[in-house]
């Protein structure tokens, strides 16, 4: 039976100094050595609306840990707001922050010999960073996020009422047909509350995936940040981690450990969910990284196979259903992630050999929490009725509105059954060809089916900034393929998100008339024919470095291919002309020492853009 890790610092005469410091930090002497130490990894910051409300959350979780018999020790990680960092040099730091967050959690837990971990995350790189840390540490862990923002609603000057999200504010800003007065109303109402942005963007996608992989409680990905139900979720997460801690240290039950929950089968189920809900392409990057931390063999090949068999069952903003736009509050009303998992399970698309921090089996999980099947508990039914308050608020659990009815319409509602899927093909796809030998990814749920096959001339850009300039000065025309290179993990460095180029294409009316291909990545808010993660990246000698203006590129989503229509002899000539120097031309960019350190070990996106520590020797 394993001993508490904390015994290292709580037992023995030689640890009198450590115990003295614990007493000084507020731990009752009688608890030292008797109760498990629970690390509470918070990510509160005033920079990010998805995290501004997390200071009191840390206290709620800590108090619940104490009440459940543990010693809570809260600390904070950094948290970058991708929306604010977008479109300038700040975005270079976003993806590298994932590794810093993972390392900081590891450092704090290992330095202080914590017995278990609660991760209070929310936005884009924070959940993936903490997930990597949890799988690396492999101690009892529960994730609980800050929750999604409510969708926005604006009354325009002409009286029209629009539902909104952050991406609307970005794309409409370059639409010359919209007045300054309406732009201001959109800006003021696009993000009305605290929480992670209201669509199925990266933050919400990842918080939903922690549910599917089994490391968080039902509702983690969909209960609104403003709702009182979220407070109950925090308290339950604290009680759950104490239960897992006792099962591991007192009953020798290692099934509760993250690596025994996040198994290959669990990764497969999480990816099936991701494809079905049309999640952010960033999730592919983060799941690849997490699989490596879990020492699970799971890569693009497995993801590609699933993308051919799992249909699209939900279209949530920025993806648009034919009749309306859905947001996370609508996913919640339809039964949340358990409802999606239930539909996949009834379609025979999930592996049943999994368990979670809250249920011993998938069958038990769905029986209790899926309102569309089985016999859901009263607690589950109550949870899914939690509704938006429709009042501007930066405070957590500030409202307790409830839906009168749930959306259980599997034929025409937010979440569809396999028989009534939005499309037979899932919401994400992996493409391969001579332009991306090791693969690239596209969110098919956000692509109009009329352009699932596309061919056009390349407009080559050596940076995101050059692409933006060309789009805004009408150098990109209908039918073009915008190629943005040297924006990969190594070449950027940092693998920037290309939300501004895609938003500007949309704002200029080219969202269904152009394609964009890059070795960088996309925001979860991206829609359109936006193909990212081209691997190998340009800086690593990928074919994307050889593209020239006017080259024709053919994209075929149904057949999962992407081809640069230039013969091999010409590509060889171009490669020889580069003489082994793969670097952007005429790009003026300041790269700090911190970013250079990241670039020195960064792998391409098909490996999750993780650090290759073997390069350290």
Curated annotation (Swiss-Prot):
EC numbers: 4.2.1.9
Pfam families the UniProt entry points to: ILV_EDD_C, ILVD_EDD_N
Keywords: 2Fe-2S, Amino-acid biosynthesis, Branched-chain amino acid biosynthesis, Iron, Iron-sulfur, Lyase, Magnesium, Metal-binding
Catalytic activity reported: (2R)-2,3-dihydroxy-3-methylbutanoate = 3-methyl-2-oxobutanoate + H2O; (2R,3R)-2,3-dihydroxy-3-methylpentanoate = (S)-3-methyl-2-oxopentanoate + H2O
Biochemical pathway: Amino-acid biosynthesis; L-isoleucine biosynthesis; L-isoleucine from 2-oxobutanoate: step 3/4; Amino-acid biosynthesis; L-valine biosynthesis; L-valine from pyruvate: step 3/4
Transferase among keywords: no
InterPro entries, per the entry: Dihydro-acid_dehy_C, DihydroxyA_deHydtase, DiOHA_6PGluconate_deHydtase_CS, ILV_EDD_C, ILV_EDD_N, IlvD/EDD_N
Top-level taxon of the source organism: Bacteria
Record protein name field: Dihydroxy-acid dehydratase
Protein species of origin: Streptomyces coelicolor (strain ATCC BAA-471 / A3(2) / M145)
Record: residues binding Mg(2+): 82, 124-125, 497
Protein family membership: Belongs to the IlvD/Edd family.
Names of required cofactors: [2Fe-2S] cluster; Mg(2+)
Magnesium listed as a keyword: yes
Function: Functions in the biosynthesis of branched-chain amino acids. Catalyzes the dehydration of (2R,3R)-2,3-dihydroxy-3-methylpentanoate (2,3-dihydroxy-3-methylvalerate) into 2-oxo-3-methylpentanoate (2-oxo-3-methylvalerate) and of (2R)-2,3-dihydroxy-3-methylbutanoate (2,3-dihydroxyisovalerate) into 2-oxo-3-methylbutanoate (2-oxoisovalerate), the penultimate precursor to L-isoleucine and L-valine, respectively.
Subunit structure as annotated in this protein's UniProt entry: Homodimer.
UniProt cofactor note: Binds 1 [2Fe-2S] cluster per subunit. This cluster acts as a Lewis acid cofactor.
Binding site for [2Fe-2S] cluster: 123, 197
């Amino acid at each position: 039976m394993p001993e508490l890790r904390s015994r290292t610092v709580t037992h023995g005469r030689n640890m009198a100094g450590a115990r003295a410091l614990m007493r000084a930090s507020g731990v009752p002497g009688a608890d030292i050595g008797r109760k498990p130490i629970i690390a509470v990894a918070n990510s509160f910051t005033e920079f990010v609306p998805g995290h501004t409300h997390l200071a009191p959350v840390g206290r709620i979780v800590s108090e619940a840990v104490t009440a459940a018999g543990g010693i809570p020790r809260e600390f904070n990680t950094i948290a970058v707001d991708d929306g604010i960092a977008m479109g300038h040099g700040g975005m270079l730091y976003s993806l590298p922050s994932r590794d810093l967050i993972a390392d900081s959690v590891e450092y704090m837990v290992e330095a202080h010999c914590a017995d278990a971990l609660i991760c209070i995350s929310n936005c884009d790189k924070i959940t993936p960073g903490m997930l990597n840390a949890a799988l690396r540490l492999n101690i009892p862990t529960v994730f609980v996020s800050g929750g999604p923002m409510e969708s926005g609603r604006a009354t325009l000057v002409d009286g029209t009422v629009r539902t909104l999200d952050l991406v609307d504010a970005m794309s409409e800003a370059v639409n010359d047909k919209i007045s300054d007065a309406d732009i201001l109303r959109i800006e003021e109402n696009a993000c009305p509350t605290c929480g992670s942005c209201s669509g199925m963007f990266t933050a919400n996608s990842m918080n939903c995936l922690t549910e599917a992989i089994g490391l968080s409680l039902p509702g983690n990905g969909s209960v609104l940040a403003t709702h009182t139900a979220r407070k109950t979720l925090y308290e339950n997460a604290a009680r759950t981690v104490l239960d897992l801690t006792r099962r591991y240290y007192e009953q020798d039950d290692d099934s509760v450990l993250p690596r025994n929950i996040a198994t290959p089968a669990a990764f497969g189920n999480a990816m099936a969910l991701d494809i079905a809900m049309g999640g952010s392409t960033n999730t592919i990057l983060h799941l690849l990284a997490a699989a490596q931390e879990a020492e699970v063999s799971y890569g693009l090949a497995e993801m590609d196979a699933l993308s051919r068999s799992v249909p699209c069952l939900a279209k949530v903003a920025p993806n648009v259903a034919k009749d309306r736009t859905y947001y996370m509050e609508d996913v919640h009303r339809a039964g949340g992630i358990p409802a999606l998992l239930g539909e996949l399970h009834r379609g025979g698309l999930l592996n049943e050999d999994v368990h979670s921090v809250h249920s011993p089996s998938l069958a038990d999980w769905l029986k209790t929490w899926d309102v569309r099947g089985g016999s859901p508990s009263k607690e589950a039914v109550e949870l899914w009725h939690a509704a938006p308050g429709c009042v501007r608020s930066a405070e957590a659990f500030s409202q307790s509105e409830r839906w009168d009815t749930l959306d259980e319409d599997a034929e025409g509602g937010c979440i569809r059954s396999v028989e009534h899927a939005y499309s037979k093909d899932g919401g994400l796809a992996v493409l391969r060809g001579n332009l991306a030998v090791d693969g690239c990814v596209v969110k098919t749920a956000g692509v109009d089916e009329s352009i699932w096959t596309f061919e056009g001339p390349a407009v080559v850009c050596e940076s995101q900034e050059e692409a933006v300039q060309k789009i805004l000065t009408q150098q990109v025309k209908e039918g073009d393929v915008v190629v943005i290179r040297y924006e990969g993990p190594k070449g950027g460095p940092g693998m920037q998100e290309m939300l501004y180029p895609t938003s500007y294409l949309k704002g200029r009316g080219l969202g269904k008339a152009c394609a964009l291909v890059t070795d960088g990545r996309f925001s979860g808010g991206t829609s359109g024919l936006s193909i990212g993660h081209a691997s190998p990246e340009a800086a690593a000698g990928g074919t994307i470095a050889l593209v020239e203006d006017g080259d024709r590129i053919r994209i075929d989503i149904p057949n999962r291919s992407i081809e640069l229509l230039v013969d091999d002899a010409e590509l060889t000539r171009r490669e020889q002309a580069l003489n082994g120097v793969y670097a952007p031309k005429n790009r003026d960019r300041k790269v700090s020492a911190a970013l250079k350190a990241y670039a020195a070990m960064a792998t391409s996106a098909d490996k999750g853009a993780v650090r290759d520590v073997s390069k350290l020797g």
